[in-house]
């Protein structure tokens, strides 16, 4: 090895040593060293990772002890004895012990994770366990049926919960859920005491809520109706009218959504009161038999005062929305009683699991329908209680981006928070939200 080669090797060694020194000196200036620093004066945003002190200040550290909770021991309570209710957003491990980080604020949560990362096992299950231990009522969507199988039994056996499994995959094995239940309930109270106007008003209110929810099935959006807005609005009033009539005059076993379809279909037929008179629809004849001050007559006023052709269009619009319920299996779930209604859900420890059939998306509209209706009925209960529920309720919407658009979802997130309603939306990517709600709705 000659002298030049020795010098070259020496220079390379010196350069390598200098490189290591520079890397070590600049390590404090790497991304790890500027976690909590803002760029400039916030021109590129002020978001940053929270410091350990901020995490400790924002979230409550709670020993996660499901084995003890199920025995009624060490239930989630703060130092002053208040029950800890909220969302598990993370955890810390300390030996064999796990400490959960719980957000107890009036907030909603968005959980994003690709398929297979453990959204259900490592996020949803701990949250449901905390909900049971702290006494929060909750509704959870379930695409595989695992959540209902695993935690339905736990909630009922160990935490004394009312449990309802709405199985859209096997409706014949599902618990019952008559979406007209509250209308029927308050109409019966009113019929037993005609002076109870509060019960009558509640029956009318829930009838209108149910009608609005049905009209908004799928892609129903008042902003997209355009020139057809009259027909959808009139169909909504017609549905509310027929629901009220069934609740008031129908037999006990016939007051369900399929009877609403059958009645509207029968009222489409025409009769000729006089050989020289123009044929009239039985719908008009039925309305003529009602007192002029009957609310069902008022609700159907838009359709009743339209031309025959417009009335046919209104009734056809209502029937088109009700077509989705014409399923021999679904009827076993929709045409009888209700295991858990909104009032029981808010006032007692209750859990509702909605099992989605991954192989049959035709039933996915029921998920949006059930969530919309339950949410709107809970708002009524909250308003009657001074604008806030007595006990927090949780909506665990697993695969939120998969099932059809929930009409008014944006307002659900904004209005529900102040009423002690927390929504936990679990998605795989923002693209799912953008597809269903558009870019503006996603944001």
Where do the language-model regions lie?
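Basic- and hydrophobic-enriched, low-structure N-terminal and domain-boundary segments
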Residues: 1-117, 121-129, 134, 172, ...
């Amino acid at each position: 090895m000659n002298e030049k080669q020795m010098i070259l090797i020496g220079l390379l060694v010196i350069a390598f040593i200098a490189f290591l020194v520079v890397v070590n000196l600049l390590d404090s200036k790497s991304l790890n060293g500027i976690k909590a620093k803002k760029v400039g004066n916030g021109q590129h945003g002020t978001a940053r990772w929270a410091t350990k002190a901020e995490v400790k200040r924002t979230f409550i550290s709670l020993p996660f002890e499901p084995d003890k909770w199920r025995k009624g021991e060490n239930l989630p309570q703060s130092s002053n004895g208040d029950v800890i209710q909220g969302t598990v957003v993370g955890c810390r491990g300390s030996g064999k012990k796990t400490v959960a980080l719980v957000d107890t604020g009036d907030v909603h949560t968005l959980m994003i994770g690709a398929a297979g990362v453990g959204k259900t096992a490592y996020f949803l299950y701990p949250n449901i366990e905390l909900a049971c231990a702290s006494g929060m009522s909750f509704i959870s969507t379930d695409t595989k049926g695992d959540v209902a199988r695993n935690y339905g039994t736990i909630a009922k056996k160990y935490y004394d919960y009312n449990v309802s499994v709405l199985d859209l995959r096997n409706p014949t094995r599902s618990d019952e859920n008559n979406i007209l239940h509250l209308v029927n309930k308050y109409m019966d109270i009113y019929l037993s005491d005609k002076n109870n106007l509060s019960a009558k008003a509640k029956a009318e209110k829930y009838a209108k809520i149910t009608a609005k929810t049905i009209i908004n099935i799928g892609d129903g959006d008042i902003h997209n109706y355009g020139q057809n807005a009259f027909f959808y609005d009139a169909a909504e009033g017609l549905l509310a009218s027929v629901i009220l009539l069934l609740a008031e005059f129908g037999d006990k076993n016939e007051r369900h959504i399929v009877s609403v379809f059958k009645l509207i279909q029968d009222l489409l037929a025409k009769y000729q009161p006089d050989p020289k008179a123009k044929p009239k629809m039985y719908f008009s004849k039925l309305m003529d038999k009602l007192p002029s001050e009957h609310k069902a007559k008022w609700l159907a006023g838009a359709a009743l005062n339209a031309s025959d052709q417009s009335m046919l269009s209104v009734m056809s619009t209502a029937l088109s929305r009700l077509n989705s319920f014409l399923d021999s299996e679904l009827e076993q779930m929709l045409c009888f009683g209700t295991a858990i209604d909104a009032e029981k859900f808010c006032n007692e420890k209750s859990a509702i699991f909605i099992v989605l059939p991954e192989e049959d998306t035709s039933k996915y509209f029921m998920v949006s329908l059930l969530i919309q209706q339950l949410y709107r009925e809970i708002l009524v209960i909250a308003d009657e209680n001074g604008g806030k529920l007595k006990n927090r309720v949780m909506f665990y919407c697993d695969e939120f981006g998969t099932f059809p658009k929930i009409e008014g979802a944006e307002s659900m997130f904004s209005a529900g928070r102040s009423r002690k309603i927390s929504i936990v939306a679990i998605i795989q990517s923002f693209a799912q939200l953008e597809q269903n709600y558009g870019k503006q709705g996603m944001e």
